[in-house]
Design a protein with these regions (language model features):
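Glycine-rich, flexible loop/turn motifs
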Residues: 28, 34, 53, 57, ...
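Hydrophobic/aromatic beta-strand elements that line small-molecule binding cavities or substrate pockets
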Residues: 7-9, 35-36, 63-69, 92-100
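Solvent-exposed residues in well-ordered beta-strands and their adjoining turns
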Residues: 10-14, 51-55, 68-70, 81, ...
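A conserved amphipathic terminal alpha-helix motif
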Residues: 119-156
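Glycine-rich portal/gate segments that line the openings of hydrophobic small-molecule binding cavities
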Residues: 39-82, 138
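Intrinsic-disorder/low-complexity, polar/charged segments enriched in Ser/Thr/Lys/Arg/Asp/Glu/Gln
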Residues: 2-8, 45-47, 60-62, 75, ...
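Hydrophobic ligand-binding cavity/cleft-lining segments
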Residues: 1-45, 49-53, 103, 154-157
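Beta-strand/loop substructures that line and gate deep hydrophobic ligand-binding cavities in soluble
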Residues: 82-131
Length: 157
């Protein structure tokens, strides 16, 4: 089953800060919903374990993620695959673009596709797509909160 997602998010910091955060394993580990492990294996390649709940199905996916077509601080492509054991297998990728906005922040846009099989695919397109969108929204909400300028820091300077 193929799943397509796209979205835009406004972040309150520069592209350079957003790009650096999106390449920082500590930031990613903190912001990815259900992320239990995220380790750098080599330049641009991460190994991950993510706990996922899709409707009645709960599983852990173990997989690899690769950052490709790096164009700092403008864009990159992320691709990966994960094995959820009896729950199924997922493989996909996303293109991310970072554009400065008029207020000194960044407009992040993405287009993602994933191919899913196994028990997860049997849950249906609507549930998988809506859950995937919620996971993306939670990730970007966490990222925004993490990158939010701290008013106390600005006042104390």
């Amino acid at each position: 089953m193929a799943v397509l997602l796209s979205g835009q998010y406004s972040l309150p910091v520069s592209r350079e800060v957003v790009y650096a955060a999106l390449n920082d394993p500590d930031v990613l580990r903190e912001c990815i919903p259900g992320c239990e492990e995220l380790e750098v294996r080599s330049d641009g390649i991460f190994a991950a374990v993510v706990r996922l709940e899709l409707g009645p199905l709960k599983t852990r996916f173990r997989g690899k993620v690769r950052l490709e077509d790096l164009d700092p601080p403008n864009s990159y492509r992320i691709s990966g695959e994960g094995d959820g054991g009896i729950a199924g297998f997922a493989k996909g990728g996303a293109a991310l673009k970072l554009v400065p906005d008029d207020e000194g922040g960044t407009l992040l846009s993405y287009e993602a596709e994933a191919n899913i099989n196994g028990k997860i695919a049997q849950l249906g397109q609507r549930l998988i797509t809506s859950t995937s969108k919620k996971i993306a929204d939670r990730f970007f909400e966490s990222l925004t909160n993490r990158l939010q300028p701290n008013p106390r820091t600005a006042e104390s300077q």
